[in-house]
Amino acid sequence: MAKEKEKLFSEFPPVSREAWIDKITADLKGVPFEKKLVWRTNEGFNVNPFYRREDIEDLKTTTSLPDEYPYVRSTRMHNEWLVRQDIVVGDNVAEANEKALDLLNKGVDSLGFYLKKVHINVDTLAALLKDIELTAVELNFNCCITRAADLLSAFSAYVKKVGADPNKCHGSVSYDPFKKQLVRGVSNPDWVKMTLPVMDAARELPAFRVLNVNAVNLSDAGAFITQELGYALAWGAELLDKLTDAGYKPEEIASRIKFNFGIGSNYFMEIAKFRAARWLWAQIVGSYGDQYKNETAKIHQHATTSMWNKTVFDAHVNLLRTQTETMSAAIAGVDSITVLPFDVTYQQSDDFSERIARNQQLLLKEECHFDKVIDPSAGSYYIETLTNSIGEEAWKLFLSVEDAGGFTQAAETASIQKAVNASNIKRHQSVATRREIFLGTNQFPNFTEVAGDKITLAQGEHDCNCVKSIEPLNFSRGASEFEALRLATEKSGKTPVVFMLTIGNLAMRLARSQFSSNFFGCAGYKLIDNLGFKSVEEGVDAALAAKADIVVLCSSDDEYAEYAPAAFDYLAGRAEFVVAGAPACMADLEAKGIRNYVHVKSNVLETLRAFNDKFGIR
């Protein structure tokens, strides 16, 4: 008996795709599921409500193993990513060193140093890296691109001075030859000439990556996932193309490239993006010859939680955003991760927020053991399909950039910047209409929060004194317009009072008063909700007694034909009158002079801006 294999599911016959579709259609009362349940993404492909085994049988990404070309599943036989935390190095280099040593004792194994206004030489690096074992931690340096070669030379000299093995010194210098065009809006057609000294200075540091594909800037500017990946591939391919023409071998260049991606809030798509990046980059490097379909074709991916979806208001929600973002990058098998502190949008992060950010990664390692499993999403019908769909769309974009003359041409003509900025505008429109939700900002705001006093960080950190000759990326965060709206209310010294005139059908009046409170709360208005009134006259009198600036009628569609005209006439222009909903009788109500409505199809941002203008809040 012990050897008999019990067939637990023998009584359940396989269910065909057609049977599933018939059942779904029946549940939708005859409406084709394509109209209701198919997600038409911004990435250029549709996502179905269910997938089956046959959906992945012919996919190119399901046959390889981890650490096997084309490396879809992983570039290594483990998932021990590095926990990175960055340090801004100011005038006090010793203080930065003290902080670095403290971080190393708290679980960090990758350090990032932002060198600002620091004289770069061996002595400076000696002070900065004092007591740090160079071969035991990844060291990443960020400085002006004009100082990258000097930094590499100084670091190489320091490695020799302390007797460390340069082959075991891992890290990077954030040399990005396209930052001028993309971020600063300044032409840089001779970037190859600038790059050669950087490559030469790195020769004695074979494990250092000095060519950065900073696709995170695209993510922070609101790029769609396929744009971030497609342009990143074209970016990396341009480095390979132009530097091989300059005399370097493909393996010399590929081993120097580091891809810095952003991590957005689209959980499953982000997992698929990193998997697709490994696959497609391996294809690009492998196209130089079969001899490169090995270690040379392995992508090196660093991931940073995106700034685009982070908020000033209800900032602790940023913790939820960064946690799921970190999970997607860890599951996808990136090489290292930076989690931005939750307060990064409004102040210089403090010890508390940095500790929380650091522990978000350590939690996934020490408590959840994400580092013990390689590519757990492999075999998922959904994620395997997403990997292919994202890969195909990104590849199309990559080819279009190549056909148009390559990444340099695209950056110099600002075609990349314009495309990403158009996506930024589209996403802002989605935020304005709540198709893209920012919890605590454009939906379910904290009514009593005041944020103006806590903002100490100057906005526009990507600006410089350069004279722009081409269009740069627009780094306005998704929540920025709602934040500006609410901050204007705070600074005006006048807080409009919104009074909910609830009457009639109990369920509908409660639902609409809650909806309207969340609607007007996004502008920081004072909200007065009510249990209900016996008549519109009673409600209007109570509103005027409360010195309401806006009176919102909350009832059912069927009752608006009676209540709305009566309330509007009795109010007699003593406050703004709003109907919560879009009733069938709207045309009749408009004919009687009722112009203001709030409902699920409203442009929340534009509606609230209009009210701010009426109250002189700018």
Swiss-Prot record:
InterPro entries: Cbl-dep_enz_cat (IPR016176), Cobalamin-bd_sf (IPR036724), MeMalonylCoA_mutase_a/b_cat (IPR006099), MMCoA_mutase_b (IPR004608). Its EC number is 5.4.99.2. Pathway: Metabolic intermediate metabolism; propanoyl-CoA degradation; succinyl-CoA from propanoyl-CoA: step 3/3. Keywords: Cobalamin, Cobalt, Isomerase. GO terms for biological process: lactate fermentation to propionate and acetate. Signal peptide: none annotated. The keyword Isomerase applies. It catalyses: (R)-methylmalonyl-CoA = succinyl-CoA. It comes from the Bacteria. The keyword RNA-binding does not apply. GO terms for molecular function: cobalamin binding; metal ion binding; methylmalonyl-CoA mutase activity. Pfam families: MM_CoA_mutase. Belongs to the methylmalonyl-CoA mutase family. Heterodimer of an alpha and a beta chain. Catalyzes the isomerization of succinyl-CoA to methylmalonyl-CoA during synthesis of propionate from tricarboxylic acid-cycle intermediates. NCBIfam families: mmCoA_mut_beta. This is Methylmalonyl-CoA mutase small subunit. It comes from Porphyromonas gingivalis (strain ATCC BAA-308 / W83).
